Amino acid sequence: QPIWWADDINAWVVSRYDDVRAIMKDAKKFSSKAMGERDHEISLPLLTDDPPKHTQLRAIVNKAFTSKTLKSMELEVKDMVSTMLDRLDPNQPVDISADFTIPLPIAVISKLMGIPFAKKDDFKRWSDALTGTSSANSLEERMPQIMEMATFFQSLIPERRQNPGEDLISKIVAAEVDGRALEDMEIVGFNMLLLIAGNETTTN
């Protein structure tokens, strides 16, 4: 069936390209706002916003993902790859997922966001909790880790306001939508989404 109800995620699943495209282009009938009503109180911008706000929010980070910008990071990413490969013991079995494919995307998105790669284990744990892929299945079990993630990003906001850099978090903190600055919890949700999008999608 091209469209069916999935009990495990409590949602309709659409599998045909033309149907998906039609739904994505019709925000009036198929609003993303319902996504923000399903889980926790932390809204994840872009996932829960429709145009024109969705378009304005995307514009904030689009420049960080242009081919020119990404090309400028190529050597740095290659260095990250080389460093991680050099750490592997050629005489021992390797868990390629744990030792390479998980930490590499986290290293790249950490660089873009200006957050310490040393917290990579926390970033992975938080991402798993927010996406529901952690060992704790219920939202109630995952909520402490989600709130820990939110607290981390909220703690960065004052410093980025006072000393902005070229990182994504600084750009989000300084951004305006419809002439107003984003509220702190909007900034927190935006950063949580970026961290997930920057590592969870790639590692999987």
How should each PLM-predicted stretch be described?
Residues 142-150, 154-161, 188:
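Metal-assisted phosphate- and nucleotidyl-transfer catalytic regions
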Residues 102, 106, 149, 176-204:
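Central I-helix of cytochrome P450 enzymes
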Residues 126-129, 171-175, 190:
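Short acidic/histidine-centered micro-motifs embedded in hydrophobic/aromatic stretches
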Residues 93-94, 168, 177:
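Acidic interhelical loop/turn segments
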Residues 120-125, 162-172:
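Short, charged hinge/linker segments at domain and secondary-structure junctions
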Residues 161, 165, 177-180:
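Hydrophobic/basic alpha-helical segments enriched in Actinobacteria
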Residues 1-97, 106-124, 128-146, 155:
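Active-site substrate-recognition loop segments, prototypically the cytochrome P450 B′-helix/B-C loop
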